Amino acid sequence: MSTLEAVAAPPAPSSAPPSTESKPDVSSISPESLTPLSSLLAELQLEQVVKTLWRATNHEPARFHLSPSHCVVEAAGNKQQTLKLSWGDVLGAHVLTADGELVQTPVDVQNDAKFLLGVFACVCKNHKPKTLKKRRVEEFFFRFKGEQMQQVLKLQKIINFVADPRNQEIVEKLESLDQLEIVERPQRKFLVLVNPVSGPGRAQQVYETKVAPMLRFANVETEVKIMDHANHAMEVVLEIPLGVYDCVVAVGGDGSLYEIVQGLMKRADWNDAIRQPIGIIPGGSGNGLAHSIAHQSEEKGKPVNAAFILAKGLPHDLDITSVRNGKETTYSFLSLEWASIADVDIGSEKLRMLGGLRFTVAFINQLVFQRPEYPGKIWYLDESEVGNPPHYFETHDPKSTDRPTMDLFDGEGQGPPADSQPEDGKEDEAKEEKADKSGIWKELDGHFRIVWVMNVSHAASDALIAPGAEFDDGYNYITFMDGAHSRKDLLAMMLAIETGDHMDKKGVQQVRTRAFKLVPERSTDLMCVDGEVVEGPYLEAQVHRGLARIMAVPRWQSKE
């Protein structure tokens, strides 16, 4: 068995117990025995395993140097080389037998027996400023004799502690790792919900080949469940115990995560459940939230980058928008769509096998053959003179199980007028109609070609609709084009959304708001929330800042 196979075996079937890695018994290593680090590193005699061009293996003497910012290895061979890894890229370390089997218990170790210390990282090479990071997994192996097993296990424990993102704040405060005191933490555990039919149908393969190995390298225990029917993910999270999983991961598209959010909000203990950290591996057609998280961390929206974010991430606040139609309330993390984009989103469902290409095909059909304009009204709350919105639990009791209120609509003196008529000749203008204690309600009235409301930056992998949006800023971003502009203008907008340059195109407007009301004139118009059809006759929406939590990469500080 190769070292890669030993550490990154495929996950167990969903019916099997949670998969766990065999690990050395290091419980007997006390914090005192781990210091000073410099003395430990000076005693170690390691040889780096180097593959040559002819697939032969060389073993060159190597020495570790660890700082609060980097793991440095100096190899003294014919060509002296230095390996420098940022802790922000290091996943973890494992001790292996010479055959690549994980060492289970360091007992009866023969002094002359050969073992390997494996260090695993997800590195970004040749990254240029203002570009997204492309990553790949790299493995580094160091041979040692059994007589040094205890010292290597100490080094392994230090590497895993410093590489664990939960310890970033501790490590960053140190001038030297000689000052490090190990704080015992439970192993991270993720619940992984795989939707095998999401998008082009490769979600399970993506997880097994690209994600599972990285989580194992990072010492994350996983429990994998394969979703086999509609709303399965919702059913799972309705029943999961809280406080058990460090993250609930959806492997699929935005629809998979939509089920998880609805399930958490349906629980009687929703106020605690919605704080369960969630994560996403892009395996669907749109993958808007995955790309929004990656974009904010300057990462590409690929599965490897998403797995890196899970392995090295920490929970960060995520805005949730309550959307109601007078009959029911749904909870959105991504977007609300009306007019041509809603027809494209829903009309392309039958083209799922095309992946992201489905939206392009459907849009061309919409532009050429379908109705061009959609009459209706949009009311939005303009708070340009008001400061940043508060986080939800700053103004609401975290222990209360009362559902999130839409106080910007329902409070005394709040909300847009219940029944308003546009002034003559002013149908396409925004008008100050009503001021309340939160700001000014303004109306957009007329015909629209597209209305796209974003909670985050990306609606899909190739749709950067709200370049300035962050997933915890407390705002929705309404991007629209009115009916006074041509199909050519709409086409120019859509051709530019991949880079966000559509904001400079003719007729494109965007407003930022915490609350809005959408009223289509035609009852047959489609409206979508996070890609799911929602009935009218109207939709009211209000953002709850930081209500949920999503895994995102922290900003690692460099100390040279």
List where the protein language model places each region.
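Short polybasic amphipathic segments
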Residues: 42, 52, 69-74, 115-120, ...
